[in-house]
Amino acid sequence: MTETLRVAVIGAGRMGADHIQRLSKRIHGAEVAAVVDVDLARAQAAVEGIPGAVALADADEALNNGDVNAVLIATPGFLHEDILLKALARDIPILCEKPLTPDAESAWKIVQAEEKLGHKRIQVGFMRRFDAEYAALGQVIRDHELGELLMLHHQHRNPTTPPGFTNEMLINDSVVHEFDAIRFFTGEEITSVQVRLGKATKNAPAGQHDPQHVLVETESGVLADVEIFVNAKFGYEVATQASFEDGIVSIGGDKGPYTRAAGRWGGNVTPGFEERFGAAYDVEIQSWVDAALRGEIGGPTAWDGYATAACCEAGVEAQKNGEKVAVKLNARPALYS
């Protein structure tokens, strides 16, 4: 591998634009070679001020560009499969924002294609694994510092949702992060998902039941629950409490300056995910670049993307029938053992 990744960023929307700035200003060992967006004007705006970067409207043109030796995919999930297969055919490093693909069937095709290649090229963008608090909790679990992990309690709260955010998206776009976190913390697959729908907020748009309570079980019997509340209004909050045999560990929440003044006390609430996980995104992309330059990946694999897609399918089914739904997984290929 060369000493520099020349990255084609495919998708210049909110997430793609953020990664373009990250790669061009804060990440070492990589540079933006091309930006692709169906809205060419948006791609052109994204490359302004980045020497040598070209704006394109077609992903194939970027993937066929010999000057490009890595790809970062930040398009909507339904476009991922085709881009992933073409990038795998080129055998170049890939960072794919979640989801790997929108469903388990297509995600399995990606796993099979990478397995056929014979080595891992895809890193999936579950950035919470790179958050300092998540990493610290993961270390406590692996070191058995407080005995065995017994239960996990997650809260995932957003101030509001964009237009078109459906009931299924509470699982596919939001709880997907907790599914990956549970797998990351336990080192186990999730075996079942149940979703309970209780009293709903008046702030939820038509067709969306909010909040929801998601119940999860892993292979060894670790129980986890997720409160997903995407119209919480007050701000953005992602928190986890882990129950061990010999103690409790809590991460997340707001721990900024605590002020007492003029007859009041308190602090500030994090407004959004960019502020909460901005540093984690930086660590994630740097890890991908460093690993790619060694011919490796530096984070979640295509198998992780497939497994979370299967969890999401079980979660959406559980939303609809109210039952405990088994997660259906194919056998894990040796490549991901």
Swiss-Prot record:
EC number from the UniProt entry: 1.1.1.18
Keyword Oxidoreductase in annotation: yes
Keywords noted in UniProt: NAD, Oxidoreductase
Catalysis: reaction(s): myo-inositol + NAD(+) = scyllo-inosose + NADH + H(+)
InterPro entries tied to this protein: Gfo-Idh-MocA_inositol_DH, Gfo/Idh/MocA-like_OxRdtase_C, Gfo/Idh/MocA-like_OxRdtase_N, MI/DCI_dehydrogenase, NAD(P)-bd_dom_sf
Gene3D superfamilies: Dihydrodipicolinate Reductase, domain 2, NAD(P)-binding Rossmann-like Domain
Gene Ontology biological process terms, A to Z: inositol catabolic process
One Gene Ontology molecular-function label: nucleotide binding
Purpose: Involved in the oxidation of myo-inositol (MI) to 2-keto-myo-inositol (2KMI or 2-inosose).
Record family assignment: Belongs to the Gfo/Idh/MocA family.
Quaternary structure and interacting proteins, as annotated: Homotetramer.
Protein name: Inositol 2-dehydrogenase
Species whose genome carries this gene: Arthrobacter sp. (strain FB24)
Gene: iolG
